[in-house]
Regions:
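Catalytic phosphate-handling regions of large nucleic-acid enzymes and associated NTPases
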Residues: 1-215
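Short, intrinsically disordered, charge-balanced linker/junction segments flanking boundaries
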Residues: 215-221
Length: 221
């Protein structure tokens, strides 16, 4: 090869670019919930798919998984697991059948045996075509919401856990009524106290919680 055709290629620059692209994809498109609506992409796509076919009746979870696969490119198992976890929190999804129990660790029945529909709360607070920004789905056949216009701090109600690339999130769940009271206090510009709470009950020591700021500690059992 002549000297004129030789070219220096800096591999470290390429790896840095590839890593940043991969990290951004995993964190934004899979692992970490968005602070605005409190949802990971798979959760958002599940709720959107349920809204598209909602007629007020229960639908088999196996059917809902299939509907969501039109928007989510990562397979039925991840969709089914995410749907069950949303349903077990008894806020956004109205369930029917054996959905397992987070207190005992019992798993849900197979998707063909359990049913679900959006809860009245979800229908009232989470959807508005006029205030929703849309994007095309991964295959360009459907449109899906970039974010859901949820009128409630769902991220705090559900809590969140996700491990991305160089980034991790762990947010404890909070009490529904206390979140409503805190939201009203914010609107009225009043002070309030808000601490984590759990559907399973228990005891919590918030002496060093520091309002949830970095460095704060909380003990639960």
């Amino acid at each position: 090869m002549s000297d004129n055709l030789k070219e220096t290629l800096h591999v470290d620059d390429l790896y840095e670019k590839w890593f940043l692209e991969y990290a951004s994809y995993v964190n934004l498109d899979r692992a970490i919930p968005h602070i605005h609506d409190g949802l990971k992409p798979v959760q958002r796509r599940i709720l959107h798919a349920m809204k598209v076919q909602d007629d007020g009746r229960y639908t088999k979870v196996a059917n809902l998984i299939g509907q969501t696969m039109q928007y989510h490119p990562h397979g039925d198992a991840s969709i089914g697991d995410a749907l069950v976890k949303i349903g077990q929190k008894e806020l956004m999804i109205d369930t029917q059948g054996n959905w397992g129990d987070i207190r005992t660790g019992d798993v849900a029945a197979a998707p063909r045996y359990i049913e679900a529909r959006l809860s009245p709360f979800a229908l009232a607070t989470s959807f508005d075509d006029e205030t929703t920004d849309w994007q095309m789905s991964y295959d360009g056949r459907k449109r899906e919401p970039i974010l859901l216009p949820i009128k409630f701090p769902l991220l705090l109600a559900h809590g969140a856990e996700g491990i991305g690339v160089g980034l991790r999130t762990y947010i404890l769940p909070h009490n529904f009524i206390e979140l409503c009271q805190a939201s009203i206090a914010i609107i009225k510009k009043k002070s309030f106290e808000l601490y984590p709470d759990f559907l399973t009950g228990g005891f919590v020591d918030v002496q060093n919680y520091q309002d949830g700021l970095q460095g704060g500690k909380i003990k639960c059992r």
